[in-house]
Swiss-Prot record:
Keyword Glycosyltransferase found: yes
A Pfam family matched in the record: Pribosyltran
Compartments, as annotated in UniProt: Cytoplasm
Catalytic activity, EC: 2.4.2.7
Predominant cellular place of this UniProt entry's protein: cytoplasm
Organism: Haemophilus influenzae (strain ATCC 51907 / DSM 11121 / KW20 / Rd)
Entry protein name: Adenine phosphoribosyltransferase
Gene behind the chain: apt
Length: 180
């Protein structure tokens, strides 16, 4: 597994001062250009959740779709989307959350989650945990539970994992990067 994790980490490029000065952007598009790294990413997440009683996989906009859909397919589970407002065609439920400078909102279809669903949330990167916390609230409002979330990248110093653990969500991340 260490070899796979090394391949994954080395396939992610770090772009300094993007999108603004002082930020190091972790670019997963370069991981997608290396089929062995992309496959290892999906395989490791699938193996982690194969026997956890998950009933639905949920991906957050937009890079969570890239990793969530193939994981759901490999697990033989339905895949649902969490999107920014006005991107879904049917009736939706929304949840607002605070950003560093302002507020954002996420939506999902009202029929995406059934009472008692055990949902796995997947996203590319865990920073502060705000997006996933809002997603957990959406799932709970629809009668589901979130005990697990998976990420390709974790930025531990931003505290997202602790924030999600405090909500009862166990986080699985493939690689950690210091600095943000």
């Amino acid at each position: 597994m260490t070899t796979q994790l090394d391949l994954i980490k080395s396939s992610i490029k770090s772009i300094p001062n993007y999108p603004k000065e002082g930020i190091i952007f972790r670019d997963i598009t370069t991981l997608l250009e290396v089929p062995a790294a992309f496959k290892a990413t999906i395989d490791l997440i699938v193996e982690q959740y194969r026997d956890k009683g998950i009933t639905k996989v949920l991906g957050t906009e937009s890079r969570g779709f890239i990793f969530g859909a193939p994981v759901a397919l490999a697990l033989g589970l339905p895949f649902e989307l969490v999107r920014k407002p006005k991107k879904l065609p049917r009736e939706t439920i929304s949840q607002s959350y605070q950003l560093e400078y302002g507020q954002d909102t996420l939506e999902m279809h009202v029929d995406a989650i059934s009472e008692g669903d055990n949902v796995l949330i997947i996203d590319d990167l865990l920073a502060t945990g705000g997006t996933v916390e809002a997603t957990v609230k959406l799932v709970q409002r629809l009668g589901g539970a979130v005990k697990h979330a998976a990420f390709v990248i974790n930025l531990p110093e931003l505290g997202g994992e602790k924030r999600l653990n405090n909500l009862g969500v166990d986080c699985y991340t493939l690689v950690n990067f210091e600095g943000h």
